[in-house]
């Protein structure tokens, strides 16, 4: 029976996919940095394609960009971003883009915000910038669902210069990010949580171990990025990511199974926030 139930869930998911049309295209805009690059630029479009879900992805990239920096860029209308636009699986970069330009480019369904990784567990770094960004984004895109992408802790052996803020402890950084997430959602309950950090934490507790990052903080090309994209895929589509047949050529079947399970479990646990 325990094998039949997951099969039935996936079968129903496949049936639902057959009725998706181009009119159901999901449009997401990430106001981010290299961590949103990891989470949405490589694996999300292929996952959506395999799940028969049309998607348009916009990612505003500025390396190490914090909430404070994003808000400063918006106030000054600074064209400092690299804007990566992904449609039909084709990624087109545009340099010298502003946040205002990206907000006006399309009628976005989802717009995500995030904190720079080095400040992700520092609650005092969030405000007043998060609230100000939310208010500003709403003026441009009042219909969009605003999201919060929870980022992940560093690898245990990370050499990131900000790791000492967390006593060079992955556990302390995880706990700090979780506490900061709880706090921001209590102040901004309208935000939809995208628990990528929780998914990476869960995946690290499996046979995969502490191998989800390629350099101590950016996600691995093989299955780190895949894990984060599975969180996005399931949350945006409502389809169980464990039923998605896609995996990249550098993943094993076991890695696919473990990462999909971690993403799904993270979304179940996110309900406690």
Regions found by a protein language model. Give the residues of each.
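Positively charged n-region of N-terminal signal peptides that target proteins for export
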Residues: 1-4
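Bacterial Sec-dependent signal peptides at the C-terminal "C-region" and cleavage site
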Residues: 12-24
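Residues that mark the start of a beta-strand
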Residues: 25-29, 56
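Conserved SGNH/GDSL esterase-like catalytic core that processes O-acyl groups on lipids
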Residues: 38-127
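Alpha-helical cap/lid subdomain in secreted, periplasmic
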Residues: 96-221, 234, 243
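Conserved catalytic region of serine esterases and O-acyltransferases that act on ester linkages
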Residues: 212, 216-225, 229-273
């Amino acid at each position: 029976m325990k094998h039949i139930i997951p099969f039935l869930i996936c079968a129903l998911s496949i049936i639902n996919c057959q009725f998706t049309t181009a009119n159901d295209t999901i449009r997401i805009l990430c106001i981010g940095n290299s961590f949103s690059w990891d989470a949405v630029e490589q694996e999300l479009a292929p996952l959506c394609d395999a799940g028969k879900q049309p998607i348009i992805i916009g990612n505003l990239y500025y390396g190490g960009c914090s909430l404070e920096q994003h808000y400063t860029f918006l106030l000054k209308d600074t064209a400092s971003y690299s804007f990566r636009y992904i449609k039909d699986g084709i990624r087109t970069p545009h340099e010298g883009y502003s946040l205002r330009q990206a907000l006006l480019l399309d009628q976005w369904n989802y717009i995500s915000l995030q904190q720079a990784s080095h400040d992700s567990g520092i609650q005092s770094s969030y405000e007043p910038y998060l609230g100000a960004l939310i208010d500003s984004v709403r003026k441009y895109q009042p219909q969009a669902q605003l999201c919060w992408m929870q980022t992940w802790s560093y690898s245990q052996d990370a050499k990131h210069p900000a790791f000492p803020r967390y006593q060079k402890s992955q556990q302390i950084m995880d706990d700090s990010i979780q506490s900061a997430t709880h706090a921001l959602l209590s102040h901004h309950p309208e935000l939809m949580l995208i628990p990528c950090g929780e998914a990476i934490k869960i995946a690290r507790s499996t046979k995969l171990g502490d191998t989800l990052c390629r350099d101590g903080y950016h996600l691995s090309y093989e299955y780190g990025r895949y894990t984060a994209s599975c969180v996005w895929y399931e949350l945006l589509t409502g389809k169980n990511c464990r039923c998605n047949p896609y995996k990249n050529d550098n993943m094993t079947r076991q890695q696919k199974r473990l990462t999909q399970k971690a993403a799904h479990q993270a979304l179940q646990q996110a309900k406690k926030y």
